[in-house]
Swiss-Prot record:
One of its GO terms (biological process) is regulation of female receptivity, post-mating. This is Accessory gland-specific peptide 70A. Keywords: Behavior, Disulfide bond, Hydroxylation, Secreted, Signal. The modification Hydroxyproline is found at P28, P32, P34, P38. Its main location: secreted. Represses female sexual receptivity and stimulates oviposition. Main cells of the accessory glands of males (paragonial gland). It comes from Drosophila sechellia. Residues 1-19 form the signal peptide. GO terms for molecular function: hormone activity. Disulfide bonds join C43-C55.
């Protein structure tokens, strides 16, 4: 019984770690912290060419 509960806790922890890794892996593509071009940011916000959102 003890080994089963430990196994379940480990599985839950692994699931949490994997679910927490996903946003971190996706974040650089969505919001680049060192943005090379500020126009890129406005373009992603879909503000249009008037706001420098030229793609």
């Amino acid at each position: 019984m003890k080994t089963l509960s430990v196994f379940l806790v480990l599985v839950c922890l692994l699931g949490l770690v994997q679910s927490w890794e996903w946003p971190w892996n996706r974040q650089p593509t969505r919001y680049p912290i060192p943005s090379p071009n500020p126009r890129d940011k406005w373009c992603r916000l879909n503000l249009g060419p008037a706001w420098g959102g030229r793609c």
